[in-house]
C-alpha cells in the first residue's frame, strides 16, 4: 500500500505556497515537488582527519540522487576527534556528543519532514549517533562511511597513531625517532588505520545491514570508496520508492536492525577483537531501536565465538587495509556462518539476505562477483594524501589464506576465546568489559595490589612518576558516565603503562572507557560506577584485585560484609564541570546499559 510522503506536509496544497517558495529558494525544481526529499546527513569538519575529506562528497551524493528525480538536501553534524581531545578535559565531551549528534539529526530530519536519509559518517561517536537517530526516525536510510586511513610506514614497519603515543612517552626512544614516527603515523585522510572504535563501528554497520559491503574496509583514498557513495545514492532512491510507492517496510532501519542483526554484529565484533566502545554503542543503538539486547547477550556470545581476525592494536602485523585484502567484513561473516555462529537469514539494506551477500561478496565463494573482487582488491596508495577517492592502486593477489592469513577460519582461529569478554564480580556486579584480543594470554589470570586514582590525570602522573610498579593493578575511579561526567577514554594511561614497559606486568580497571587503540589488560565500563555507589569507589591502595578472564570474574579480596561496611573513598580531584555536562550527568545511565539518557 502506498505511503504518504512525510514531506508532503510542506510541498503539497495551496496553503503550503510559502513553504514551496522556500524549497524553491533551496534549489528544488517543480518536477521534484511531490517526490521524496532525501536528507544527506554529512559530518565534514577540518578538526578530524576521518572527516576532513567529506566536504565535496555530500554534493556528489546529492547530484546522483537528483539524476534519479528526487530532491536532496545536505546538512552537517558535529564531529569530535577523540585523538585530539584525548588526555585533557576535552575528552569529557566525546561520549555526550553521541547523543547531541543523534538529537541534531532527529531535529533536522523531523523539522523539515525529510523522507529518507543517506548518513555519511566515519569516526568514533558519529556513526553510533547517526545510527541512534536512524532507529528513532525509522525512515529509509543508507550508511556510507568516509573510510579508513592508510597505515603509516617507517623503517619497513607499519605504524599508526598509537605508536606515536607510546613512543613519545618512552624515554629510551630518541627525539628524532619520535619525530619520524609522528610524521609517518597518519599519512592520509580517513579514520585511524587500526581496528579502533571508528573502524569497528563502520565494520559492524555492514553486519547490522545498513551499509554496503566494503563500507568498513576500503581505504578513504581509493576510487572504490567514491563508488560506494554513488551506490549509496542510487540505493536510497530505490529504497525510498519501495517504501513510499509500494509500502515495502523491509527497507526501514528497524526492519533491518533486528535482534538477530545485533547478535550478528556483536558476534562479528568479538570475532575481530573490535573496540570495547562498540559494546556501549550497540547497547545504545539497540535501545533506540526497541530491541532487547543486553550485556548478558554479549557475555553469552563471547563464550562461544572464537577470534578470527587480529588487527592493530591487537597486533602490528595487520591494519584495516589488510582486512580488505583478505575479503573484508563479508569474509569474516562467511567464516562465522560456516560454523553456524550467525543468522544469515537477516535482511540487508541492499535487499539481499546476509546469505545472498556472502554468496556474491565472499572472495572464496564460487559465485563471487567481479564487483566484489574489485572492492577487495582496493589497495593503499602509499603516499601522503588527503583527497577522497583520488588513487587507483589495486592488489594483484588477494589474501585467501584462512590458515595463516589476516582472516582465519574456525579451525585456525587465533584463539578459541573471542576478542571481547564480560567480567562480573564484587567490583562489577553489573559487568565490565575487556578486549581479550589485546591481552597477552600470560596475564589472563592476574592478581595484584591496587593503586587507586580518582582521575585520568592523576593516573598518568602516577604511572609516569614511578608510583606504579610491576604487579600493580591501576584503579581509576569516578570517570564513568555520571562521575566524569562523560566517561573519558583512558588511552594515555594504558599507553604510558606500555611506555614504561609494564604492558605484560600491570592491569588497569576503571569505570571509564578505553580508546579502540587500547590493548593490554585494560578493563573498563565497570558497572555500577563509583558515582552511582559502585564498589569500585570503595577500593583503596593495597587492596588485592583478582582478575580471571577464563572464569569471567573480577573481584577485590574482601568479604561482602567488609565491602558493605567500607565507605566510599572521597574524591580529591579539582575538576570544573560546565552546565552542559552536568545536564548530561543528571540523566545518563550506567555503562552496562549503553550510557543512554534515561528520560521519563
From Swiss-Prot:
Sequence similarity: Belongs to the IlvD/Edd family.
Alphabetical keyword list: 2Fe-2S, Amino-acid biosynthesis, Branched-chain amino acid biosynthesis, Iron, Iron-sulfur, Lyase, Magnesium, Metal-binding
Residues bearing the modification N6-carboxylysine: 125
Residues where Mg(2+) binds: 82, 124-125, 489
Binding locations of [2Fe-2S] cluster: 123, 192
EC numbers for this chain: 4.2.1.9
One Gene Ontology CC term in the entry: cytosol
Summary of the function given for this chain in its UniProt record: Functions in the biosynthesis of branched-chain amino acids. Catalyzes the dehydration of (2R,3R)-2,3-dihydroxy-3-methylpentanoate (2,3-dihydroxy-3-methylvalerate) into 2-oxo-3-methylpentanoate (2-oxo-3-methylvalerate) and of (2R)-2,3-dihydroxy-3-methylbutanoate (2,3-dihydroxyisovalerate) into 2-oxo-3-methylbutanoate (2-oxoisovalerate), the penultimate precursor to L-isoleucine and L-valine, respectively.
Reactions performed catalytically: (2R)-2,3-dihydroxy-3-methylbutanoate = 3-methyl-2-oxobutanoate + H2O; (2R,3R)-2,3-dihydroxy-3-methylpentanoate = (S)-3-methyl-2-oxopentanoate + H2O
Active site residues per record: 515 (proton acceptor)
PROSITE patterns per UniProt: ILVD_EDD_1 (PS00886), ILVD_EDD_2 (PS00887)
Cofactor notes: Binds 1 [2Fe-2S] cluster per subunit. This cluster acts as a Lewis acid cofactor.
Protein name: Dihydroxy-acid dehydratase
InterPro entries: Dihydro-acid_dehy_C, DihydroxyA_deHydtase, DiOHA_6PGluconate_deHydtase_CS, ILV_EDD_C, ILV_EDD_N, IlvD/EDD_N
Cofactor(s) this protein requires: [2Fe-2S] cluster; Mg(2+)
Gene Ontology BP term (one): isoleucine biosynthetic process
Subunit: Homodimer.
Pathway: Amino-acid biosynthesis; L-isoleucine biosynthesis; L-isoleucine from 2-oxobutanoate: step 3/4; Amino-acid biosynthesis; L-valine biosynthesis; L-valine from pyruvate: step 3/4
Amino acid at each position: 500500500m502506498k505511503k504518504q510522503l512525510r514531506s508532503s506536509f510542506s510541498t503539497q496544497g495551496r496553503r503550503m505556497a510559502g513553504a514551496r517558495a522556500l524549497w524553491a529558494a533551496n534549489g528544488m525544481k517543480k518536477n521534484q515537488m511531490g517526490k521524496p526529499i532525501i536528507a544527506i546527513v554529512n559530518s565534514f569538519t577540518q578538526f578530524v582527519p576521518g572527516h576532513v575529506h567529506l566536504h565535496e562528497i555530500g554534493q556528489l551524493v546529492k547530484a546522483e540522487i537528483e539524476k534519479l528525480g528526487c530532491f536532496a538536501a545536505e546538512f552537517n553534524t558535529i564531529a569530535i576527534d577523540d585523538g585530539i581531545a584525548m588526555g585533557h578535559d576535552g575528552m569529557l565531551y566525546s561520549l555526550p556528543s553521541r547523543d547531541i549528534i543523534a538529537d541534531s539529526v532527529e531535529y533536522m530530519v523531523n523539522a523539515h519532514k525529510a523522507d529518507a536519509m543517506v548518513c555519511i559518517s566515519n569516526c568514533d561517536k558519529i556513526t553510533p549517533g547517526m545510527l541512534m537517530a536512524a532507529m528513532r526516525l525509522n525512515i529509509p536510510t543508507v550508511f556510507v562511511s568516509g573510510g579508513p586511513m592508510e597505515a603509516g610506514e617507517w623503517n619497513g614497519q607499519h605504524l599508526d597513531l598509537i605508536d606515536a603515543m607510546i613512543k613519545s612517552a618512552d624515554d629510551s626512544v630518541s627525539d628524532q625517532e619520535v619525530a619520524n614516527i609522528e610524521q609517518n603515523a597518519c599519512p592520509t585522510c580517513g579514520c585511524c588505520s587500526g581496528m579502533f572504535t571508528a573502524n569497528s563501528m563502520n565494520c559492524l554497520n555492514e553486519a547490522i545491514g545498513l551499509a554496503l559491503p566494503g563500507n568498513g574496509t576500503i581505504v578513504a583514498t581509493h576510487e572504490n570508496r567514491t563508488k560506494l557513495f554513488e551506490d549509496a545514492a542510487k540505493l536510497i532512491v530505490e529504497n525510498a520508492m519501495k517504501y513510499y510507492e509500494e509500502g515495502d517496510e523491509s527497507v526501514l532501519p528497524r526492519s533491518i536492525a533486528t535482534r538477530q542483526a545485533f547478535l550478528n554484529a556483536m558476534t562479528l565484533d568479538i570475532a575481530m577483537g573490535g573496540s570495547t566502545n562498540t559494546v556501549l554503542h550497540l547497547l545504545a543503538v539497540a535501545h533506540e531501536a526497541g530491541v532487547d539486547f543486553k550485556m548478558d547477550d554479549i557475555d553469552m556470545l563471547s563464550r562461544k565465538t572464537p577470534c578470527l581476525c587480529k588487527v592493530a592494536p591487537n597486533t602490528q602485523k595487520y591494519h584495516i587495509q589488510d582486512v580488505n585484502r583478505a575479503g573484508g567484513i563479508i569474509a569474516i561473516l562467511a567464516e562465522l556462518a560456516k560454523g553456524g555462529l550467525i543468522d544469515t537469514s537477516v535482511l540487508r539494506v541492499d535487499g539481499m539476505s546476509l546469505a545472498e551477500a556472502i554468496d556474491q561478496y565472499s572472495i572464496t565463494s564460487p559465485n563471487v562477483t567481479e564487483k566484489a573482487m574489485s572492492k577487495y582488491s582496493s589497495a593503499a596508495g602509499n603516499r601522503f594524501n588527503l583527497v577522497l577517492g583520488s588513487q587507483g592502486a589495486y592488489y594483484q593477489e588477494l589474501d585467501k589464506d584462512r590458515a595463516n592469513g589476516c582472516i582465519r577460519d574456525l579451525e585456525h582461529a587465533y584463539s578459541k576465546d573471542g576478542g571481547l569478554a564480560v567480567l562480573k564480580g564484587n567490583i562489577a556486579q553489573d559487568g565490565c568489559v575487556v578486549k581479550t584480543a589485546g591481552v597477552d594470554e600470560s596475564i589472563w589470570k592476574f592478581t595484584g595490589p591496587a593503586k587507586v586514582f580518582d582521575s585520568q590525570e592523576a593516573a598518568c602522573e602516577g604511572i609516569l612518576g614511578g608510583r606504579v610498579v610491576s604487579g600493580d593493578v591501576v584503579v581509576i575511579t569516578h570517570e564513568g558516565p555520571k562521575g566524569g561526567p562523560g566517561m573519558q577514554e583512558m588511552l594515555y594511561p594504558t599507553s604510558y603503562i606500555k611506555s614504561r614497559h609494564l604492558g605484560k606486568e600491570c592491569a588497569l580497571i576503571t569505570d571509564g572507557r578505553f580508546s579502540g587503540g587500547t590493548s593490554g589488560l585494560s578493563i573498563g565500563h565497570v558497572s555500577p560506577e563509583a558515582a552511582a555507589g559502585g564498589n569500585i569507589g570503595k577500593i583503596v591502595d593495597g587492596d588485592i584485585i583478582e582478575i580471571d578472564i577464563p572464569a569471567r570474574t573480577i573481584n577485590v579480596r574482601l568479604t561482602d560484609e567488609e565491602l558493605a561496611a567500607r565507605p566510599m573513598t572521597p574524591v580529591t580531584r579539582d575538576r570544573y564541570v560546565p552546565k552542559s555536562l552536568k545536564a548530561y550527568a543528571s540523566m545518563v545511565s550506567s555503562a552496562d546499559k549503553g550510557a543512554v539518557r534515561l528520560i521519563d
